C-alpha cells in the first residue's frame, strides 16, 4: 500500500503526465490489430499450420453450396429384390384384400327365471362393453317396462323390433260370444253395458270422504283426459272398468296419493 501511495503522489507532481498519456493513445491508435497467432510469428516462433479455428474462418468466405445429388436418378433397382418370395410387382391399388370372417365372442347370458320358497326371480345380465351412461339408460328402460305393467297386460302385448329399438303394442282381444239364457229382471250396470269404457267419459264417479267435513270427490274421465287418444297413450284401454279408468287418470294427473288419503278409493 505504501508503494502504491507513493506512485500516486509522484504522478500528481509529474508535469509531463498529460503529454505521456496522449503519446500512449496515439501509439495504440496507429497499431494494427493482430491475432495472437500473428504476434507469435513476429516474435520468431516457428511457423506451423494454422489452427483449425483459423481455417474455418477462412473457408467460410469461400464456402459454396454443395451439389445436391439426385438420389432417384442414381437408384438402380435390385433385381434380386424382385425375385423375393411374396414380392408383388405393380401399384398397391391392384392388391385385392382377402375377406376374413370375424367372430366376436360374448359371455352374455339370456334372462333366467328362477323359483324358490321365496317366490320367482328374474335375472337379467347387462350387455358387455356399456359405458356408465349406457348402463344407466339400459336400467331405466327395464324399469320403465316393469312399471308399465300397472297399466296394461304385458303378456298380451305384441313385440316388434325396429331400427330404433323395440315397439310394444297392446293386442286388441275380441271377446268371446257365449249363448246364454237371459235372466228376467236383471239390469246390468252402466259400466257393463258398454264395450268401451270411454263411452262413459262424461259420466262422473263419486268417492266418499274418509273424514267428516269433506265434500265427496266427483270426477269424470273428461276432466282427467283431453281425449281418448291421451287416455290410451298412458296405458288405458277400453276393457277397463269405469273405476279403473278414473284411478288411472288420478295417477296420470298425480292426484292419486292425495285423493286416497282423503277419500275411499
Swiss-Prot record:
Region entry Oligomerization, spans: 109-170
This protein's record includes keyword Cytoplasm: no
Positions of modified residues (Phosphoserine): 60, 64, 226-227, 233
Keywords, in A-Z order: Chaperone, Host cytoplasm, Phosphoprotein, Viral RNA replication, Virion
Region listing for Interaction with the L polymerase, in residue ranges: 49-105
Disulfide bonds: none
UniProt GO cellular component terms: host cell cytoplasm; virion component
Localization annotation: Virion; Host cytoplasm
Region of interest (Hinge), ranges: 171-193
Region named Interaction with the Nucleoprotein-RNA and template-binding: 245-265
Modified residues (Phosphotyrosine): 14
Composition bias type Acidic residues, residue spans: 58-70
Residues with the Phosphothreonine modification: 62
GO MF assignments: RNA-directed RNA polymerase activity
Mod. after translation: Phosphorylated in the N-terminus by host CK2. Phosphorylation of the phosphoprotein is required for the transcriptional function of the P-L complex.
Stretches the record annotates as Disordered: 42-74
Entry annotated with the keyword Kinase: no
Pfam families: Phosphoprotein
Site residues (Involved in oligomerization), renumbered to this chain: 138, 141
Chain positions covered by the region annotation Interaction with N(0): 1-60
Family: Belongs to the vesiculovirus protein P family.
Domain remarks: The N-terminus is disordered and is involved in binding N(0). The region of interaction with the L polymerase is necessary for transcription. The hinge region is highly variable. The central domain is involved in oligomerization. The C-terminus is basic and essential for binding the N-RNA template.
Subunit description: Homodimer. Interacts with the L polymerase; the association of P and L forms the polymerase complex and positions P optimally for encapsidation of newly synthesized genomes with the nucleoprotein. Interacts (via N-terminus) with N(0). Interacts (via C-terminus) with N in ribonucleocapsid (via C-terminus); this interaction allows to package the L polymerase in the virion and positions the polymerase on the template, since P acts as a bridge between N and L.
Task performed by this protein: Nonenzymatic cofactor regulating the function and conformation of the RNA polymerase and part of the transcription and replication complex. Binds the viral ribonucleocapsid and positions the L polymerase on the template. Acts as a chaperone for newly synthesized free N protein, so-called N(0). Plays a role in virion assembly.
Listed name of the protein: Phosphoprotein
